[in-house]
Each structure stands twice: as structure tokens, then as C-alpha cells.
């Protein structure tokens, strides 16, 4: 079986000795770097990226990752709170649950970030809202895969975990 360790941002921890890190969903405003939790989340994600440690990011941490990668992040006109949508998740139609006030936006399906590598972007073609990201050693999602509104949550998590755990060279 798996061994899981849960740590709050204010607790001492190290990423050493773990096969995978899961960065949590929030709540919080991803742009308020002066807030201890948010500032810490930015530092942790930058560390995971630079050290190429496998990680999965959900909701708030997906938004912070998006900012760290240089994507545009905006407050939504109307928050998604318990909203189920069908999306294109890297070529597969999925019904997922959203609970977000902020959303990253992108105009393309793939970007190249120096020092990180190629990043695939799952997004709404009309609005540009980013649903998920896949890059070398990481995956992230704006929606909540653990929500009852996400029809195939365990499978989606498994697919994205497999992606994050496979070594890919930039």
C-alpha cells in the first residue's frame, strides 16, 4: 500500500523521501503572495518545478502553478461553486466539478517554458479558461477530481498521477 503524510504549510517538512507530492486545493486567493499560506505555496511549487520532483496540483495550487509558469490568471465574473461541466481533458470528454473564483487563461494548447519544458494545456476553446496542465513530472487541474460532481474522478486522478510519475525529458 501507499504511505501518506499530510502537512500544513506552517509545519516543517521536506520533499525528500517521497515519490509524489500532492499540492492542495485551497481555499485562498492565489495572487496574495503576502499571505503566509499563499506565499509558501508559491515557494513550494517553484521548488518542485526546479527540482523536477513529481507532483499533482489541484484548484488553488493549480492556479499558483499557472502563475509560476507565466499564464494569465483572472478573477471569474461569477465564481464556479459546485458547477458540473463537460470538458475536453487532453482529448477525452469528461464531466467534472468546479469550485473556483479564479481561472488561468491560455490561447494555445501547448507552451514551452525554459527550464521546465513543454506543457500541454487543456482549456475551453471559447473562453481560454485552463482546465488542466501536464508537464515534465507534473499534472494539475482546476476542477476537483475528488468531487461527486466529477464522474470518473478516481480514473482521472490515476491517469494524471501516471503522467506525473513518468520521467519525461524537456
Regions found by a protein language model. Give the residues of each.
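Flexible gly/pro-rich beta->alpha loop and the following alpha-helix that scaffold active-site loops
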Residues: 1-56, 69
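General structural signal for secondary-structure boundaries
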Residues: 2, 8-11, 105-109, 170
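Pocket-forming structural segment of enzyme catalytic cores
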Residues: 43-47, 54-58, 63-155, 163
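Short, hydrophobic alpha-helical segments
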Residues: 157-170
Amino acid at each position: 500500500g501507499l504511505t501518506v503524510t499530510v502537512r500544513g504549510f506552517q509545519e516543517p517538512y521536506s520533499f525528500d523521501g517521497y515519490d509524489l507530492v500532492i499540492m492542495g486545493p485551497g481555499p485562498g486567493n492565489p495572487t496574495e503572495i503576502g499571505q503566509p499560506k499563499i506565499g509558501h505555496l508559491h515557494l513550494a511549487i517553484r521548488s518542485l518545478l526546479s527540482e523536477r520532483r513529481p507532483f499533482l496540483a489541484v484548484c488553488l495550487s493549480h492556479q499558483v502553478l499557472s502563475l509560476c509558469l507565466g499564464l494569465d490568471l483572472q478573477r471569474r465574473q461569477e465564481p464556479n461553486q459546485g458547477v458540473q461541466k463537460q470538458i475536453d481533458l487532453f482529448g477525452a470528454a469528461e464531466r467534472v466539478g468546479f469550485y473556483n473564483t479564479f481561472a488561468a487563461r491560455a490561447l494555445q494548447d501547448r507552451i514551452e517554458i525554459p527550464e521546465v519544458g513543454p506543457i500541454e494545456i487543456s482549456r475551453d476553446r471559447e473562453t481560454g479558461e485552463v482546465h488542466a496542465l501536464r508537464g515534465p513530472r507534473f499534472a494539475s487541474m482546476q476542477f476537483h477530481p475528488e468531487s461527486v460532481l466529477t464522474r470518473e474522478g478516481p480514473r482521472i486522478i490515476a491517469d494524471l498521477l501516471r503522467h506525473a510519475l513518468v520521467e519525461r525529458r524537456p
